[in-house]
């Protein structure tokens, strides 16, 4: 698939839905017109011929209206329910057919193996979904670790370091990237970037394995940092920024660092562009990828972002006096309401980072090769999210969700449902609805440890995203009972004791610590999927683990089955 063909499906859906809406509006107008004429006719008949004739005329008009409404209802059902389901089924059928038609590995001698970039049929329909009902979510447990071949390369010297993983999975394939530092773990001087793509296949033991089909090693002297990756049709898109100074210095800068988009296709086409999104220069002192993965949505690739906003700019002023306090805080914080509000308002501004406002948002880029000025920056409203931080975007069916790292004072897992508004075919605004939870805490320093429950200024924590196993919208009150899984560092203040868990809003349901007590670790990424053949749900937990042999950190993928007990 070439880059120009990528948005075709989304465009066709938009055209179909637009045409359907216009047709329905026409039917509605005709119905109103007929009803209006019928009322006039009824009055004329009653004044001239009495009630007997009017009843007959009115009955025929009522029958006509019923017929029109019946047709309209059928059109609404077909366009809103039946056709989307048929399109989804057709897509899955085509993917399955492509997979079965891929070149066989039993080829003539000296010919290459022509694997298609499509996951095994068992997984195509089991990706990016909610896998359990609310009731089932109360009875989930973690299975044992499964022994898979790692698709993530590691350092090969004691001085090397691999850090900041980003992983994205769709129906067709997966994409992965991490930073490679040759000496130490500081990435602001010199580093390289590893990128790979591949597919999920079953092993002879029945559980899944991740097969790498393409790799790219960016070692060209450009210090790309904090890269986020997203699967796109036919390949991967990666968003990075370029800097050779410490993070704090980025926030003190007058202009944001260089922003780059890299597109890598399965056919070995590689495109890299320096992008200049409008509204960034003179507004953002620094703009950073969220490191967690992005998503492909309606022809646009969306990436999580955060950074420092310059004082007295339009964005700064639009966020004045806005603050967000998670729902669970009211019952857990001993501060009075006025103190909570004041502390929450001030938590977005950091003297350590040059008195910038620390802001989260989304970078939206159309899937095309000329991206210099086409990407858009969409900030979240700060009365809906906490202080800006690293993050990740997810697709569950047709819904977009967002994870925000708990850098700020609230130490619990922060997940949001995102609504994206489109204007003239472009994303123009975003809003976020928090999934309320008082689990699972991250470690932090000082007054910002895992035990903190009250608003205040914090700049701490660690990236530890989570995967929703149940749909927060399935309850009458959004998110009142949601179950999710991930990995966290089970301590109040230190980055130690990596633990995989299943939790709901109020408690950890099941957990398994990896390694001995005191094992050092850092970032954690979690993605789940279903084997539709066996109906089993698997989760991959990608965790940065410290190593005493090779490098300060190694990135390790762990696979577990989530079982319904």
UniProtKB/Swiss-Prot annotation:
One of its GO terms (molecular function) is host cell surface receptor binding. Residues 1-19 are intravirion. Keywords: Disulfide bond, Glycoprotein, Hemagglutinin, Host cell membrane, Host membrane, Host-virus interaction, Hydrolase, Membrane, Signal-anchor, Transmembrane, Transmembrane helix, Viral attachment to host cell, Viral envelope protein, Virion, Virus entry into host cell. Disulfide bonds join 161-185, 175-236, 227-240, 333-454, 365-375, 448-458, 528-539. Residues 223-228 are annotated as: Involved in neuraminidase activity. CDD domains: HN (cd15469). Glycans are attached at residues 110, 139, 267, 504. Coiled coil: none annotated. It is a single-pass type II membrane protein. One of its GO terms (biological process) is virion attachment to host cell. Residues 41-565 are virion surface. Gene3D superfamilies: 1.20.5.110, 2.120.10.10. It catalyses: Hydrolysis of alpha-(2->3)-, alpha-(2->6)-, alpha-(2->8)- glycosidic linkages of terminal sialic acid residues in oligosaccharides, glycoproteins, glycolipids, colominic acid and synthetic substrates. Attaches the virus to sialic acid-containing cell receptors and thereby initiating infection. Binding of HN protein to the receptor induces a conformational change that allows the F protein to trigger virion/cell membranes fusion. Homotetramer; composed of disulfide-linked homodimers. Interacts with F protein trimer. The C-terminus (head domain) is involved in binding the cellular receptor. Belongs to the paramyxoviruses hemagglutinin-neuraminidase family. This is Hemagglutinin-neuraminidase. It comes from Parainfluenza virus 5 (isolate Human/LN) (PIV5).
